Amino acid sequence: MNPDLNMNPHDSGRTDPYAPELGEIATDEGDGENVTKTGTTTVGLATEEGVVIATDRRASLGGRFVSNKNVVKVEEIHPTAAMTLVGSVGGAQSFIRTLRSEASLYETRRDEPMSINALATLAGNFARGGPFLAIHPILGGVDDEGSHVYTIDPAGGVMEDDYAVTGSGMQVAYGTIEGEYESDLSTEEAKELATNAVQAASERDTGSGNGLVIAEITDEGVEIEEFDDLADAL
């Protein structure tokens, strides 16, 4: 039996086919050097009015070299939902394209958009069974049941919360949010808190920085803005 047939794709000795990265990715030990590739900070906050998602704009190679300073790490995938790009660029982009296509096909066939819970479940199924390497996105959306923020982990786990953070800057960003979050935040207050969280992470995390992308999601649609200076978003 060929031993390679049973090799876990995240085991050592395998070369990462996706680069650069926008987030945590598997360690490649094939050359004897353990290099954990990290980067990015993405934040999602649910409010009564909708969902706010904020991310930085930096892409890195191995978490040590800045390969791009203008990456838009949040994309619309549904008329009232958006998802962040976290992980390898190739894997994250492929994941979003696949999910967007399925959501569009569902709407075409049924003449109504998919619920955000169903979209999150579908995303988890794809992450679990698909070839999407080391992704960990945030899904935010609004439907008839209200505002939703989900995280999708690399193994396909789906978790909903009032707010979520993923990426290498998550510890700093979570600390900022935990100290200021309130359940009755307005959209503008949520934008300010999300911006502060990304800014704090960018100060300490080498994989995060180079501006800000803010997505505001309501029952009317998705609006995405970019800022070179985080102060301009406040």
From Swiss-Prot:
GO terms for biological process: proteasomal protein catabolic process. This is Proteasome subunit beta. It catalyses: Cleavage of peptide bonds with very broad specificity. Keywords: Autocatalytic cleavage, Cytoplasm, Hydrolase, Protease, Proteasome, Threonine protease, Zymogen. Component of the proteasome core, a large protease complex with broad specificity involved in protein degradation. GO terms for molecular function: threonine-type endopeptidase activity. It is an enzyme of class 3 (hydrolase). PROSITE patterns: PROTEASOME_BETA_2 (PS51476). Residues 1-35 are annotated as: Disordered. The active site is at T40. It holds the Pfam family Proteasome. It is found in: Cytoplasm. One of its GO terms (cellular component) is proteasome core complex, beta-subunit complex. The formation of the proteasomal ATPase PAN-20S proteasome complex, via the docking of the C-termini of PAN into the intersubunit pockets in the alpha-rings, triggers opening of the gate for substrate entry. Interconversion between the open-gate and close-gate conformations leads to a dynamic regulation of the 20S proteasome proteolysis activity. Belongs to the peptidase T1B family. The 20S proteasome core is composed of 14 alpha and 14 beta subunits that assemble into four stacked heptameric rings, resulting in a barrel-shaped structure. The two inner rings, each composed of seven catalytic beta subunits, are sandwiched by two outer rings, each composed of seven alpha subunits. The catalytic chamber with the active sites is on the inside of the barrel. Has a gated structure, the ends of the cylinder being occluded by the N-termini of the alpha-subunits. Is capped at one or both ends by the proteasome regulatory ATPase, PAN. Residues 1-39 form a propeptide. The keyword Acetylation does not apply. Its EC number is 3.4.25.1.
